[in-house]
């Protein structure tokens, strides 16, 4: 029995192994000829025969998604599930690294029958029925060009990226025209994201200005409170020196008069 993390990892064929050993007959030294010895079945054999153990406690080797290293003499982590990597992962990572703001766009992930991807024909371009334009459209279109047109990853990405920019510009123009037409008939629109962001930035800047002014006032007050202390001592020292010089000059004048 092998124990790992306080779990019993019994072999799946434990019952079959013990059963086959019990069915084996053998003779012990000193036994009379024709007499065979049988093993005594363990007490748990009948219970395991009626209620076989589940296989959740076993450790089957997971499906290998990549070829093993032939140079590795001691394979490691053979029981650990391997990472599932798809071809689209690298394309998706590249696109969202170059266009991080696409992740901020709201998306509807609700599907009709779970087979929406089968209704798409990526040979016709990025615009597909009932599927809004998004980064996933770019990934699927690029993947189709790589598999069917024989393009490299960079060339397909550059071509699809230009198509994506053109469609985004069309959407922006349509949205702007619709907003202008609605305002002409009296519609009112609130602040957009850019205006809200500018106001938040201005508010934070004004708060920082107040804090900086307060800190400067505190520093100026501390400096003013410290200056009279040192200045007073200097003035007292200068006054004492002047008094001494004045007294010395008066004494000299009196001595001259006496002489």
Curated annotation (Swiss-Prot):
Signal peptide: none annotated. Pfam families: MRP-S25. Keywords: Mitochondrion, Ribonucleoprotein, Ribosomal protein. One of its GO terms (biological process) is translation. It is found in: Mitochondrion. One of its GO terms (cellular component) is mitochondrial small ribosomal subunit. Belongs to the mitochondrion-specific ribosomal protein mS23 family. This is Small ribosomal subunit protein mS23. It comes from Pyricularia oryzae (strain 70-15 / ATCC MYA-4617 / FGSC 8958). The lineage of its organism: Eukaryota, Fungi, Dikarya, Ascomycota, Pezizomycotina.
């Amino acid at each position: 029995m092998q124990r790992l993390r306080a779990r019993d990892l019994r072999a799946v064929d434990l019952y079959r192994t013990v059963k086959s050993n019990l069915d084996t007959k053998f003779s012990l030294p000193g036994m009379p000829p024709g007499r065979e010895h049988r093993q005594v079945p363990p007490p748990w054999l009948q219970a395991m025969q009626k209620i076989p153990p589940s296989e959740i406690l076993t450790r089957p080797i997971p499906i290998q998604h990549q070829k093993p290293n032939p140079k590795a003499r001691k394979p490691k982590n053979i029981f650990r599930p391997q990472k599932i990597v798809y071809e689209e992962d690298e394309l998706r990572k590249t696109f969202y690294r170059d266009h991080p703001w696409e992740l901020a766009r709201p998306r509807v992930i609700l599907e009709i029958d779970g087979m929406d991807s089968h209704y798409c024909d990526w040979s016709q371009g990025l615009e597909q029925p009932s599927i809004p334009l998004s980064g996933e459209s770019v990934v699927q279109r690029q993947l189709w060009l790589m598999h069917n047109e024989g393009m490299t990853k960079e060339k397909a990405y550059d071509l699809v990226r230009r198509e994506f920019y053109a469609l985004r510009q069309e959407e922006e123009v349509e949205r702007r025209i619709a907003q202008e037409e609605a305002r002409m008939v009296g519609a009112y629109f609130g602040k957009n994201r850019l205006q809200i962001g500018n106001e938040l930035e201005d508010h934070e800047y004004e708060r920082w200005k107040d804090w900086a002014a307060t800190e400067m006032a505190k520093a100026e007050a501390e400096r003013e409170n410290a200056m009279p202390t040192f200045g007073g001592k200097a003035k007292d020292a200068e006054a004492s020196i002047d008094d001494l010089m004045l007294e010395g000059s008066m004494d000299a004048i009196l001595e001259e008069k006496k002489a």
